[in-house]
A protein has these predicted regions:
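Alpha-helical transmembrane segments and their immediate juxtamembrane cytosolic regions
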Residues: 2-419, 424, 433-441
Length: 441
């Protein structure tokens, strides 16, 4: 019998060994991040507000990008929750889990705000008339607090996702330290109940839509850890769903039953979203009834896509490959660097007035090259590894998890960071990138 500890949710039919890794979730993260880079490069050309724009907007991008926007971030928080449960099970307690999350999330966040985000903020203020070079900006102006050349300082820009994930993880760790057994049991029973019949598709969908609409005209739609109640009303439940799923294997058959009707929901919601987006493009604000319909459709699409993509990850992608581990490890460094890379390359290349396909290829290829260089160099420098989200050294493993668990401990924490979008609204500030209906970035 394996020495691995087996964690079983109430009502589960099989146990989950602590060393077990879901390769499908890794591939899902990797694919989502690849999509993220393409999406953010396309934002330079889309007719929506963003950090830096080409002089020629392309309305043809509205429909495909409108179909991507609603589900990228929710997917990432759900996958993050799943990976966080695996890490918690291996940590041996809430305190170790909290310490691990703080180091692996807050250190890169601090480094990113000090050394990576300033590049993007310099381009932002240059766009509004700032007269000095980057070194002058970083040394004398970046550290101010308040409004400066129309931008708010300080800012974590695209790293807002890391801040949110750190907050959710540390709050969850505190709750688990307080009532861990009760919370795990409650999540397990909720998962067991949702796994019956068609509940998994419809109950969360109705709950998420209700929460979103309840806050729509009450809380402003804006990025901010203490003000983004609309975002938290979606991200927190999905993070907890992923956390529960990792300990409740009985949910996987329910996902398998739900994915086809979920795609039907996605298709219907997509028609609504695109129709409203085309009718009220850019900063145009639709009537309240249509705005509520748009928000409900976005939430429905997000939940449907999560179920469908989780089924794909479980059924077709849950297998290992030589490329999986290096790609999964590269996710977080790529996430930290990719956004400022796009902005800086665009800042210097747009005046060349290249043909659109050449410009797109330059932005995409240049961003991939910069991210790859940072990852390949940074992973070889010991003191730089934790700053770009990599483990400084292999994590010590509890005896109960020693057999078979080492592979997860070395690269599993990077997986929980979901450094992809992973999608996100934070790439632009509240004024420049926030559409009245939803952030685009």
């Amino acid at each position: 019998m394996s020495k691995d500890k087996v964690l079983t949710a109430p009502g589960a039919t099989i146990g989950i060994p602590r060393s077990q890794r879901h390769y499908g979730m890794d591939w899902l993260r990797i694919a989502a991040f690849g999509l993220l880079i393409v999406y953010h490069v396309a934002m330079v050309f889309a007719p929506w507000a963003w950090v830096i724009k080409t002089s020629h907007a392309y309305p043809q991008l509205i429909a495909p990008m409108a179909l991507l926007t609603p589900w990228r971030l929710p997917l990432l928080f759900a996958v993050s929750g799943y990976a966080s449960r695996k890490l918690f099970d291996r940590a041996g307690g809430a305190a170790v889990f909290a310490r691990s999350r703080a180091v692996r999330l807050l250190v890169p966040l601090g480094f990113g705000m000090a050394a990576v985000v300033p590049v993007e903020m310099w381009v932002r203020v240059m766009e509004t008339g700032y007269p000095h070079g980057y070194l002058h900006f970083w040394a004398l102006d970046y550290w101010r607090v308040g409004s400066f050349y129309g931008r708010e300082f300080p800012s974590w820009e695209h790293l807002w996702f890391v801040a949110y994930l750190a907050a959710y993880s540390l709050l969850l760790a505190a709750a688990l330290a307080w009532r861990g057994a009760q919370i795990i049991e409650m999540l397990g029973r909720a998962a067991e109940w949702l796994g019956q019949g068609p509940r998994l598709l419809w109950v969360p969908l109705v709950a998420l839509v209700t929460a979103r609409l309840a806050l729509l005209f009450v809380a402003p739609e804006r990025q901010g850890l203490v003000s983004d109640w609309g975002g938290h009303s979606q991200y927190v439940p999905l993070f907890l769903f992923g956390f529960a799923l990792a300990g409740a294997p009985r949910l996987w058959p329910a996902i398998a039953r739900s994915w086809k009707p979920a795609l039907g929901v996605v298709a219907l919601a997509g028609v609504v979203i695109v129709a409203i987006e085309l009718r009220y493009p850019g900063t145009a604000v639709p009537p309240h009834a249509l705005m509520a319909l748009d928000r409900a459709a976005r939430v429905a699409m997000a939940w449907g896509m999560i179920l469908a993509l989780f089924h794909i990850a479980e059924t077709w992608w849950n297998r290992d490959h030589d490329w999986r581990k290096p790609l999964a490890e590269a996710v977080f460094p790529f996430y930290i660097v990719h956004h400022p890379a796009i902005v800086l390359i665009a800042w210097y290349s747009l005046p060349l007035d290249l043909p659109p396909f050449a410009e797109f290829a330059l932005l995409l290829g240049g961003t991939a090259l910069v991210c790859s260089a940072v990852y390949l160099v940074g992973r070889r420098i010991g003191w730089l590894r934790p700053l770009i989200g990599l483990a400084s050294k292999p994590v010590a493993i509890a005896p109960a998890a020693a057999q078979g668990g080492a592979a997860f401990e070395r690269d599993g924490e990077v997986a929980a960071l979901v450094g992809l979008d992973a999608a996100h609204r934070g790439a632009a500030d509240d004024a420049a990138a926030m559409d009245p209906r939803e952030a685009r970035a």
